[in-house]
From Swiss-Prot:
This is Flavin-dependent thymidylate synthase. Disulfide bonds: none annotated. Pfam families: Thy1 (PF02511). Catalyzes the reductive methylation of 2'-deoxyuridine-5'-monophosphate (dUMP) to 2'-deoxythymidine-5'-monophosphate (dTMP) while utilizing 5,10-methylenetetrahydrofolate (mTHF) as the methyl donor, and NADPH and FADH(2) as the reductant. A motif (ThyX motif) lies at residues 100-110. GO terms for molecular function: flavin adenine dinucleotide binding; NADPH binding; thymidylate synthase (FAD) activity; thymidylate synthase activity. The gene is thyX. Its cofactor is FAD. Pathway: Pyrimidine metabolism; dTTP biosynthesis. Its EC number is 2.1.1.148. InterPro entries: Thymidylate_synthase_ThyX, Thymidylate_synthase_ThyX_sf.
Length: 291
């Protein structure tokens, strides 16, 4: 068999992931995520946990229960047996947030060796928002449509102007590593990102949450879809025990126990700070506190 034909293999193959292999899954206005390669499956996690040769149990429900146990009790090494390599096209400012997750292998398009494409991320109208009043890192209420359109045009104009200067500097013979300095951080870059499943789930837990910036959340959402196709049992356990669950402090647990016993507990009596109290109430009463 010639390498790369995909006609024969003895390794674990996940057909749902094979169906989207090398396809560009669109993100934002011009970005994408593309699965380049992968290793392992749900079976690999189960096999590693049992430290045995073979395919685990014959009952899928038992494998799912074991994966749930591993996830619930924060085991790590069984999930590290699976790896995935992604080709990602993303705005530079998103890439700078992404690389805060250091437990992965990255090789990025180099503007020292090559010329960056004339492609910029421009947020759509509904994402043009004022500074949040309760989150120093986030955005708040969307701006009126006319103001948003003016800002979008400003982004476009500045991006085009800086790119024209970039091209002019290159034409003058300036080194590429210097000419790139004037580019805006909404320019698109590309990289290959290889990560094991444990660290990927950590990335998704942090970057798919409401506190993450919208743009990187969109990438996390797309990758979460890939994880669902790749390791459906792990995905289900991750959603159950991490993504849609909540962890509370010892003091918050005391408050919950008092409430279950019928006591009324105020924020002042709870010993919790205002922010933690608010977080606890949003978990207990997602539709708003009762009167």
């Amino acid at each position: 068999m010639e390498e790369g034909t995909g006609e024969y293999t003895k390794r674990v193959v996940v057909h749902a992931l094979e169906d989207i292999l090398h396809q560009e899954l669109r993100v934002l206005d011009k970005g994408f995520v593309r699965v380049v390669d992968y290793m392992g499956s749900d079976e690999s996690v189960v096999q590693a946990a049992r430290v045995s040769y073979g395919r685990g149990t014959k009952r899928t429900s038992q494998d799912a229960a074991l994966i749930g146990y591993l996830m619930r009790h924060a085991h790590t090494s069984p999930f590290e047996m699976c790896e995935i390599k992604l080709h990602v096209k993303l705005p530079i400012f998103v890439a700078r947030q992404w690389v805060r997750h250091r437990t992965a292998s990255i090789n990025e398009y180099s503007a020292r060796y090559s010329v960056l494409d004339r492609e910029f991320y421009i947020p759509d109208e509904k994402q043009i928002a004022e500074q949040s009043t309760n989150n120093a890192q986030g955005r708040g209420t969307p701006l009126p449509a006319d103001a948003a359109k003016r800002i979008m045009e400003l982004f476009r104009r500045n991006s085009e102007l800086m790119y024209e200067d970039y091209e002019a500097l290159l034409e003058q013979g300036l080194a590429r590593e210097l000419a790139r300095m004037n580019l805006t951080i909404n320019c698109y870059t590309q990289w290959y990102w290889k990560v094991n499943l444990h660290n990927l789930l950590r990335f998704l837990a942090l970057r798919s949450g409401a506190g993450a910036q919208y743009e990187i959340r969109e990438y996390a959402s797309r990758i979460l879809e890939i994880v669902r196709l790749w390791v459906p049992m792990v995905h289900a356990a991750f959603v159950e025990y991490h993504l849609e669950s909540s962890t509370i402090s010892r003091s918050a647990l005391v408050v919950v126990r008092k409430m279950l016993q019928g006591e009324k507990v105020s924020m002042e009596e709870s010993g919790l700070g205002r922010r933690e109290w608010g977080e606890l109430m949003s978990v207990l009463y997602p539709d708003g506190e009762p009167e």
